[in-house]
Structure formats: structure tokens, C-alpha cells
Amino acid sequence: MKRKIYSQLLKWKSDDNGQNSLLIDGARRVGKSYIVEEFAKNEYESYILIDFNNTMQQVLDLFRNYLYDLDTFFMYLQLYFNVKLTARKSLIIFDEVQAFPEARAAIKYLVKDGRYDYIETGSLVSINKNVKNIMIPSEEIRINMYPMDFEEFLWAMDEEAIMQLIKNQFTKLKPLGTDMHRKAMTLFRQYMIVGGMPKAVDTYVKTRDFTKVDTIKRAIISLYRNDIQKYAEGNEVRVTSIFDLIPSQLQKHEKKFRLSEIKAGARMREYEGAFFWLNEAMVANICYGATEPNIGLNLKLENSSLKCYMADTGLLISMAFDENRIMQESLYKKLMMDKLEVNEGMLVENIVAQMLRAKGHKLFFYSNYSREAEDRMEIDFLIAKPSITSKHNISPIEVKSTNRYTISSLEKCVRKYKNYLSTPYVIHTSDLAEKDGIVYLPLYMTPLL
């Protein structure tokens, strides 16, 4: 599986020259271990991979007993793994480092020693249980890894050429044309339904069997539920309650999370730790309400108002159709043909959130329920562009899952806040268009924002 993060690994190796370890954080099953081991095989003379979920006690004892004597530490490490390490030409991988925090703390001394490069991979690496007894090393560069994005899915499907066309047309703000748009949307629907978990994608590419794909996705969902019970530390019930309600909350027209559906009288201060846990575990994407669509969205963040999306839309589909344990092939095919009577808006909005987060955007939305009609509006997403123009850098986004829709909220937002805003977007299922200063983007162009 070709992944974009590989280029970041190459850049770290060439630019950093052993000054820092690289920590790759991501949800379980997004492909961290696979891509790091591929990198080790391709870019180093030798490597050692220590899986802290499944390693010898003798290896763990090395970190407790020999960090003061690194010559002996490395001698035993090479003996235990039967691998010869070469200074500045070998890599040591700490896989699932959250399972053994002492190894993460040791990075300070190992990097200072300078003999080898180090990559750490982990999930839940910032959760209190995994860091409370260690000093987090400053000699550590952290990057996030997400489920496969649409371009990576196209690579897996051997459809690279169409992505280049999509990029070219986005740059020129020109439509793809009927035939190529239809092909791009067909591929995008496959991506949305299968999701971006590498094993699910690989199975789909090899078999085109949705039932096998669904079995894999449900195993991942079960793994996430087990992680909540294991790592949520006193918050298990709250985190599980939120996690299980994500599909039904997104099914509603107004997708703000309603705590009253968990417990009457529930308050955000009781549950904000649970939402934080899901966001840090990268199992969910939290979208915060902003009090105004203006520059400095973090300053306008409203903690009491949020939406909670699944980090992977393929997993959301398997959660939403959970009645029969394994979703039937016929249901998947109806979903593929857009003939399943379901509120597809929740799937489309979820995958837009997923793509924006993977691009590096923090997620915000804006809503105003004023009695004045001109002030009453709901904007699905606000994103900050990297450069501030004369009109600042906030772009409002509305997401539409059907061909027939209105954009009254977006039009009101542009009228009221025109001096604050950059380009407004409608993300929809049709081809690219531009009208009255609003850019209408097909779903598959979202990752280019």
C-alpha cells in the first residue's frame, strides 16, 4: 500500500540526521506499523522492530537496567533480535510504544547517543494513562497518520491518472466534464463505502467482496470498543455512550451532539473529557462551534457546542447498519447505486470532515438561531486557509448530498461577514462550477482545500 506519509519519513531522515526520533500517532489499524517497516527495509541497511504489545521480558528489562550503559544495551538488543546494527545506517522501531512508556522516555538518551535513528509508532499516545509516569522527550517530532485518503485509495485501485486530472481541473477551477465526473464519483462512492482502513481497502481491491470488507471493519470497531474499556480510565461508560451514539446523532438534520440523549440533564462539563479522549485516540473527529466566522477560530471556540464524526466513514457505515452483525452484500450494492433509503447526508458530511482533518484542518462550524431571519444560519464547516488575504482567511463550507438543494445559510453568511471571509464553497455531488463568487466543488476535490 502506497501512503503519502512515506515522503514525510524520507524528509525526516534527510533533514533531521538523527537529532530527533519520529513519533507516528494514529488510530489503531491505519497502517502505521506496515509503512514504517517498509521504510526501514527500503531506506536502511538493517533495522530492529520492537513490538511492545508482544515482546520478550528480557527486552523490556534492557530499558530498566542498561540505559546507563548503552554499549551493553545495544549488544543485548542485537543478540535478542539477531540483527547487526550499523552506526548511522540502522533504524530501531518502537512499535505500539504506548504499551511501554519507559521506552518513550528513553528516547532522550538514545537520540543523544546518536548511533541510530528511531521511529516510534503508537495509538492513544497522549492519553493520561500512557504518559502520567514519564517525562515526554523533547527530542521527538510527532506526526499524525490518518486512514487512507481518496488519492491513496485511487493508488490502491490503480487509478492514479484520474487524480492528476482532478488536481489540474481544481487549479484551473474547471469542471471534469460529464464522463470523467461520473467515473470520479463512482470511484469516490466506493471509497466512501469501503473507507480508508488499509486492510479493508486491500480486501476490496483483491476481492470486490463487500461482505469480506464489512467483516474487517466490524473487527476494527470491536477493537476500538475494547480499547475504550482498557484505556479510558474511569471514563469508559461516557466514552462508550458517545461512541455508540455517533451514527444516530449524525442522522439528525442538526448534527450537534445532544447529551440529553445519553442522560437527562447531562452537561458538557461532565462529558468533555470523553470527547477529548475520542479525539486524541483519533477514533472520532470533533468539530467545534465557533461564535463568529472570523480569523482566530480558536479564540472563538465554543466548547459546549460540538459535532462528533467518525474518523473513518467506512466504519460509520458498518456501525449504522449493525442490526444483522454483518452487512449484506445487497445492502452495500444499493448504497453504491444510491438506492438505499437512508439519510446520505450524514455519510457525505462525515467524509468531508474526514478529508478536511486528514489535510490538517482543525474542524469548526457556525450556527446562529437568531429570531431575525437574515441572521439565522447553519454553516457546516469553517476552515482557515494558510495565508491571510485582504479578506482574511476563513472559508465557509456547506455540504450537499443531493442534486437539489438551497444555500440560503451560505448566502446569508457571505452577506453578513463578507469582509471577514475568503472563498465560500459548496461541496456537492455535481461537477465543479463557480457562480456569484461561490465555488461549487465535487466531493472528490475536498482534499485539495
Model regions and ranges:
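A cross-kingdom feature that marks ATP-driven nucleic-acid transaction machinery
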Residues: K2, K13-L22, R29, E38, ...
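Short glycine-rich substrate-engagement loop in P-loop NTPases that contacts/grips substrate
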Residues: N54-R88
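Conserved P-loop NTPase "ATPase switch" module shared by AAA+ and STAND
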Residues: L85-E102, K255
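Structural recognition of the conserved hydrophobic beta-strand(s) that form the central parallel beta-sheet
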Residues: I93, D117-S123, N144, F153
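Short regulatory helix/loop adjacent to the ATP-binding pocket of P-loop NTPases
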Residues: Y109, S126-R142, L154-E159
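Interdomain hinge/linker elements that couple catalytic modules in large macromolecular machines
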Residues: D158-V348, Q354, K362, N368
